[in-house]
From Swiss-Prot:
The keyword Cell membrane applies. A lipid is attached at C35 (S-palmitoyl cysteine). The lineage of its organism: Eukaryota, Viridiplantae, Streptophyta, Embryophyta, Tracheophyta. Keywords: Cell membrane, Coiled coil, Lipoprotein, Membrane, Palmitate. Gene3D superfamilies: Band 7 domain. This is Flotillin-like protein 2. It comes from Arabidopsis thaliana (Mouse-ear cress). Signal peptide: none annotated. One of its GO terms (cellular component) is plasma membrane raft. May be palmitoylated.
Amino acid sequence: MFKVARASQYLAITGGGIEDIKLSKKSWVFPWQRCTVFDVSPVNYTFKVQAMSAEKLPFVLPAVFTIGPRVDDTEALILYARLISPHDKQSNHVNELVEGVIEGETRVLAASMTMEEIFKGTKEFKKEVFDKVQLELDQFGLVIYNANVKQLVDVPGHEYFSYLGQKTQMEAANQARIDVAEAKMKGEIGAKERTGLTLQNAAKIDAESKIISMQRQGEGTKAEIKVKTEVKVFENQKEADVAKANSELAMKKAAWTKDAKVAEVEATKAVALREAELQTQVEKMNALTRTEKLKAEFLSKASVEYETKVQEANWELYNKQKQAEAVLYEKQKQAEAQKAEADATFYSKQKEAEGLVALASAQGTYLRTLLDAVQNDYSCLRDFLMINNGTYQEIAKTNALAVRDLQPKISVWNHGGEQGIGGASGSGMKDIAGLYKMLPPVLDTVYEQTGMQPPAWIGTLSK
């Protein structure tokens, strides 16, 4: 059965396949499991705690505590589900539990403090009560969301706080009279002090005005001298800049004159060099002309014979090249055929490897899905695979062949006669009942004949 909890609820599931308690907002609940729904919304608890101070003075502490499970802590929720969830949150059991914790901690804390300390340090007293109560509630997975501790109240027959209030009122009235008298005294003294201070401040201001006037005159003289000095420095700096610029200009003019003279000399020498080069080229051309004339006269016959020999050699070379190209073409075709055969073999092996990878990936996905289904229980996965692959049948077959000529122990059982319930629904229930009755003897027989224990989630064998 699939169950879903409300927004402020949790499912506490116990039973087969769960080690302790499983908390969830929604889950499948199997027949061998139990599910309890518990609410985690906080509840208000109102108390009037009677306590006694260190002076044995009783008092009443009205308080309203908003208490509920700690929803942000899984361990606390499991603790609450184990100890508190079987009881209704408004039940006397839970109410007495919370009230007992609050009263016990409040009384212990109040017994260590005087009434004066409790009354004057109310805020600290409330904080101490809150901290100590929270420490005790942690044992039950509960947390205090809000604690409203009201003003301390007298126990009937004891008027300590009433008298303490009257004392405070009288002290306030007396203090008010003292404050009025002190205010009048301070007013008269202050008036006289203000008059004296006025005269003192007037004389002080006159003296300071004269001093400031002299300081201003001195500062004006200093500023005038400073400005004149800066003007003189600026003039000297500009004169130096002009002298520097004139010097740089003279140096540049000298460099330009030098470059012009060097360029003129280089041009003259370049003309002379060019004339010499042209004369050399003319002489070379004359020598080449004479050489060509001699070649034409003496080497014409040798050239004809040379050309004839070259043509014959070229023809032989052409024939040999064609023969070599034919052999090379044949070798290339053989190499291409071998390459095509190797490519086909490689493609076949590659596809076979891809098939193995796809098979391994599918088997990995199958195993991960089975592990998720059994919540990462490897023993359950192993048993399922052995059943699904027929391992148990093969073991039984092997054992039967081994003991064929012996006298094995054969277990025969009968799960009783059929009891008709009626209809298709009755037939289905008979099959399920027969299956459950048949399962323990089968497991006993397997254990006796093979020594193999059934998985933990099926149950233990009867001894």
